[in-house]
Amino acid sequence: ENAMKKGQVYEGVIETVEFPNKGIVNVSQEDRRVIVKNGVPGQKVRFSVNKVKKGKAEGRLLEVIEKAPQEIESACPHFGQCGGCTYQNLPYEEQVKLKESQVKAMMDEAVDGDYIWEGVLESPVKSEYRNKMEFSFGDEYKDGPLALGMHKRGSFHDIVNVCDCQIGDGDYRKLLACTLECARESGLPYYHRMRHEGYFRHLLVRKAEKTEEILIDIVTASEEGFGSKPKEFLDKWAAALQALELSGKIVGILHTKNDSLADIVKDEGTEVLFGQDYFYEELLGLKFKITPFSFFQTNSLGAEVLYEKAREYIGDTNEKVVFDLYSGTGTIAQILAPVAKKVVGVEIVEEAVEAAKVNAKLNGLDNFTFWAGDVLKVIDELGEIPDLIMLDPPRDGVNPKALMKILNFGVDRLVYIACKPTSLA
């Protein structure tokens, strides 16, 4: 009955791609749908079956035999190897169409009855749009030379040097190359996650779109056991960065120590090697102070489009109390505050709440209160009844219990900004 086995190789055409990157191939001779990741609709592919369950099968893409009719050469030489991007082999319009169909399919399933679908708002910039990049140290293959870049697609260990990455601008590429050169010269090893030894971990670069201010932070393990080498590296590196000819302006060079076992950029003490540990960005005429680890939409010009839309949806806020839940550094709150009676923000990350207060002062706004805490717990203590509610939760979405409390306020309008469609649906 179950003729499809692990290790078998098939060919087929990817008919659709479901969120986030699951290509669906119908294998007619077996009458099975197989999920093959990392393809685009219309490609004829060869794949080997690596999982077979009741009615479900998954395959690993071996090669693309025929390109899809709408496929193009990616502008980035790293595409396909690098795990950073998924659809660079499609023109922007096709990427948008594909993502729109994925989200629409989820909403159709989740929403009972009719709803208005407004389609996709495009980003004003299609490449070099990111205001933040995180790069990892490692090697391209076991015991290879030191590398600094992104994880290889589907790999926890291997790193691709992405010196021609197209999603940040030329300054990112220069800073990346300069850092890698200094790191290689130092002879210090990268931090090996399995063995918990080594030095270099991550490079974090943030650059504001409007002010062009740049903040650079290198994340390393502690220097124990490496003698004077780390200090020598940091001095040389900071000097080398300042000597680069960049289009933006470096306002801060930082060094963060992180000895935690997880592979995340985590702050366990940061020293300033040059300048300051923050920079400014502007959105819709407001000014925001951003610290190395605080959350900020990664595409500044795209964020303006998003927040304009949110402002349009929330409608007239005149003389109204607005709750901004999961408020982060207060971006949305401040965009709404100038015309509202009062905005109440709730955010669990203390650092973000402090930043939000600073940002409110910067923009001369005083009709605000910010609460630090979990929305679920704090919502009962706010002592106010909102007229409108704005939600902008993290990827996992809103805790179901918190959602009930939010709905019980019975507001006329609630605007939900979701950064992951599955948690919204």
Where are these regions (language model features)?
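Short, conserved phosphate/pyrophosphate- and ester-handling motifs at nucleotide-, phospho-/glycolipid
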Residues: G42, G168, N299
